[in-house]
Amino acid sequence: MNDQPAVISPPMPRRTMLAAALAAVVVPLSGCGGSAGEAASVAPRESVTLPASGRPSASPEGLTPESPAQDLPAPDEAIPKDPKRLADALTRTAGRLRDAIDDWRRTGDPAKGEAPEPVVLLSLYEQRVYRHLARNPAVASRTYGKLPKDMVARARDNVTAIRDLLSLAHPVSGPIKIKVESPEPADALLADFRRAERRFGVEWEVLAAVMLVETKFGRVRSPSYVGARGPMQFMPGTWKAYGMGGDIDDTGDALLAAANYLHASGAPGDYRRALYAYNHSQAYVDAVLLHARQMKRDIRNYYAYYTWQVYVITTKGERRLTGP
């Protein structure tokens, strides 16, 4: 994308139908204060740590805490049905995922390599638990009461965001024709988010949350059924106005264009208005802001979201298209 001055035009409608999050639902993780029905807002950045990865009173089915190197959850690991065991499994998984992300950032190479297996498997299990709770509100309510106090808001935010997006999903019938691929490295994406923030003043966590919801950080590469394209799902007409001569399929260009569009639509002064212009759904706006809020509270939530996988909702149930 050219580094010429931004083309700022009046905000224009942009109904994408979310190739990943709505038509082929790609759903998130995270958490902070407020009730499930609360309107989300972008909180100030702060440093929040997750609960320590101590041993809970019960373990997820199939997991034993004695051998951490060997007890990573399988991709299809059973999810406990009892709220107490479910809360224990979620608490333990969150702590272990935090530690795995710290190890990855300290000893791995998030700027070049893929996420290590512990991060991928723990994140997938956590994502699956949140999806289960989003589809079962009564179970979710009982589970919240069994969680440590410092995890309740985090769980509630994640479940609420996923439920919001599921409410917008249109089940796919027939053959699934969705192109998926591996995302760019986590820290390479983070550099692009921060570059866009510096240029347009739109917080990088909001941009990351939009990309999470739209295409699971670029994993979904198919156009939406209405023709929205690229990692940030732009309609061609909107791209012409805000793309600044860049490539709609290039991640860095698409993030700059998204920041340009959101800035022209009211961000950072009014993120709700700007996001509603990006996609005309209050549920969408709430979900994006909940995810952004979680990343602002703890950057490790960004790395956890980065490893969330793509799900498609079909008339016969849901299918996971990416991951192990």
Set out the residue ranges of the language-model regions.
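Amphipathic alpha-helical interaction segments
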Residues: 121, 125, 209-212, 257, ...
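Cell-wall glycan-active module
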Residues: 1-195, 290-324
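Solvent-exposed loop/turn segments at secondary-structure junctions
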Residues: 213-218, 228, 238-240, 280-284, ...
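Amphipathic alpha-helical interaction surfaces
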Residues: 129-132, 136, 199, 213-216, ...
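Glycine-centered flexibility sites
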Residues: 31, 218, 227-230, 266
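Surface-exposed patches in mature extracellular/periplasmic domains of secreted proteins
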Residues: 138-142, 201-209, 222, 267-278, ...
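Short, solvent-exposed loop/turn and secondary-structure capping segments
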Residues: 221-224, 288-289
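Alpha-helical segment that forms one wall of the substrate-binding/catalytic cleft
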Residues: 184-199, 205, 231, 236-292
